[in-house]
Design a protein with these regions (language model features):
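Transmembrane helical bundles and short interhelical boundary loops of multi-pass, membrane-embedded
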Residues: 29-39, 48-49, 77, 269-286, ...
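Transmembrane signal-anchor helices characteristic of membrane glycosylation enzymes that use polyprenol
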Residues: 31-87, 172-174, 248-263, 343
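Loop-to-helix entry region of an early transmembrane alpha helix in multi-pass inner-membrane enzymes
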Residues: 32-33, 114, 128-147, 300-312
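Aromatic/glycine/proline-enriched transmembrane-helix motif characteristic
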Residues: 47-53, 59, 155, 275-348
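Extracytoplasmic catalytic/substrate-binding loops of multi-pass membrane glycan-assembly enzymes
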Residues: 78-92, 107-119, 279-290
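Specific aromatic-rich, kink-prone transmembrane helix
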Residues: 147-151, 189-206, 363-364
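Membrane-embedded helix bundles of polyisoprenyl
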Residues: 162-199, 210-222, 247, 339, ...
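Perimembrane helix-loop-helix junctions
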Residues: 225-249
Length: 432
């Protein structure tokens, strides 16, 4: 079974929009890839059904149409190859193919952590185009991402319309589509798991939450922007100290297949330290962080240290604030605190990349659905992130990145004010 779709996207000047950092080629999806895509779409619909959101045939028809459209849009971009795919991901899969598949886990392959490499090793056994399989993995977690955002928002509203809105908003959110279907990146994996971790942590299932957080961290180091929320949950007595033992246990369990394949234990568990050493020396990599304002910095090493110190200061200040007001902590306060940390930590850190605000994009969207008066927050986050995506994919700036940084600074201020209102209530406003 083969269905060919030739993709050409043009801008108003007549040139190819994505001509710089990736090439769109003919999409020739074989039977396996097509079936997997259909299964993912079916899963997206089933999750809504089992969550009790499809009560009438009309609901099923409308949601089925939206799911079909979401996956059709993704399929159109499956033929796009970025330099990340050409120079790294495709070569890693080929390495597994040429060195015994899972047996090649015994050595060092790429700089992603091993849980993601398990999937690449699996793909080396299949006859389907590696590009499609990599993107299908990411789009599978797009579904889990939408589900996690919906569940998190569901702690604050029971409105079926609003829950369906956040579900489909995530599936159609520009950075979500670009990240998985165009770029072939895996940010949806760690963020979907992190959102579920927050949901379980805030809804009385701390063990599940900690396990999900460990899985998130096992896939991507950037989960550290979200992990501090569990300290807030500890302060709020939603988790206990012993629950933190689940984190290393689950993490080591995920490392075990690679270790059993012969990969050295120390190399396996310290991979992230190697990643931090290779992050690069530039203060900013197309990120809407505070360093987007930096111009002609004379001592970049000092600036990097100051940024790191500022990020840690913010984090510990939030911890102290919540400890001081621990008797006033509600789910609303935790949601505000989570947004402060997820936006503020990467905003202040040096060496941030274009995709590092992906979690902020989605958490702010769930926040806005929970509290519709703050509808502008995800729009500002998305604006900031898209500037970075455009800079990478087009190799030129649509606007200078400091405009995105200004947008995120405003989001951070609003999150601080919102959280202050929750922790120091005169009369708590009802947002839902």
């Amino acid at each position: 079974m083969s269905s060919a779709i030739l993709l050409r996207i043009h801008d108003f000047s007549g040139g190819d929009v994505f001509s710089a950092f990736f090439v769109c080629v003919e999409v020739d999806m074989d039977a396996l890839a097509f079936i997997l895509l259909l299964l993912e779409a079916g899963l997206a619909l089933l999750l809504l059904y089992f969550d009790g959101l499809l009560k009438k045939p009309a609901h099923v028809l409308v949601c089925a149409g939206l799911v079909a459209l979401a996956f059709a849009v993704r399929a159109l971009f499956f033929g796009c190859e970025t330099l990340d795919y050409q120079d790294f991901l495709s070569r890693w899969v080929q390495h597994f193919r040429e060195n015994g598949g899972f047996a090649a886990l015994s050595g060092s392959v790429g700089n992603y952590n091993v849980p993601y490499l398990y999937f690449l090793a699996l793909f080396s056994y299949l006859g389907t185009d590696d590009l499609y399989l990599i993107k299908l993995l990411s789009t599978l977690f797009d579904v889990l991402l939408a589900f996690g955002a919906m569940r998190l928002a569901g702690l604050f509203t029971r409105s079926r319309v609003r829950l369906l809105f956040v579900y489909f908003a995530v599936l159609f959110w520009p950075t979500v589509v670009l990240n998985s279907a165009v770029w072939g990146q895996c940010d949806s994996i760690y963020v979907s798991l992190a959102l579920l971790a927050l949901y379980w942590g805030m809804s009385g299932k701390p063990a599940l939450g900690m396990a999900a957080m460990a899985c998130s961290f096992a896939f991507k180091l950037q989960a550290v922007f979200i992990m501090p929320v569990f300290v807030l949950l500890l302060i709020a007595k939603r988790v206990k100290l012993w629950h933190f033992l689940i984190f290393p246990a689950v993490y080591m369990l995920l490392m075990l297949p690679a270790i059993l394949a012969g990969r050295p234990v120390l190399d396996t568990i310290t991979l992230y330290f190697d990643q931090m050493g290779s992050v690069g020396s530039a203060l900013n990599y197309n990120s809407p962080s505070i360093f987007a304002f930096a111009r002609d910095v004379s001592d970049e090493a000092l600036a990097a240290k100051l940024g790191t110190a500022a990020a840690f200061t913010l984090m510990f200040a939030v911890f102290a604030w919540f400890w001081w007001r621990r008797s006033s902590i509600t789910n609303w306060a935790l949601l505000g605190g989570a947004l402060i940390l997820v936006v503020g930590i990467p905003f202040l850190l040096p060496h941030m990349h274009d995709r590092y605000f992906y979690a902020a994009d989605i958490l702010s969207l769930a926040f806005a659905v929970a509290a519709p008066a703050y509808f502008f927050l995800p729009l500002l986050c998305e604006f900031a992130s898209l500037l970075g995506y455009h800079a990478y994919l087009k190799m030129r700036y649509l606007l200078l990145m400091h405009w995105g940084a200004a947008a995120l600074a405003f989001v951070l201020i609003v999150a601080l004010v919102f959280t202050a209102a929750q922790l120091h209530p005169v009369r708590r406003q009802k947002y839902s």
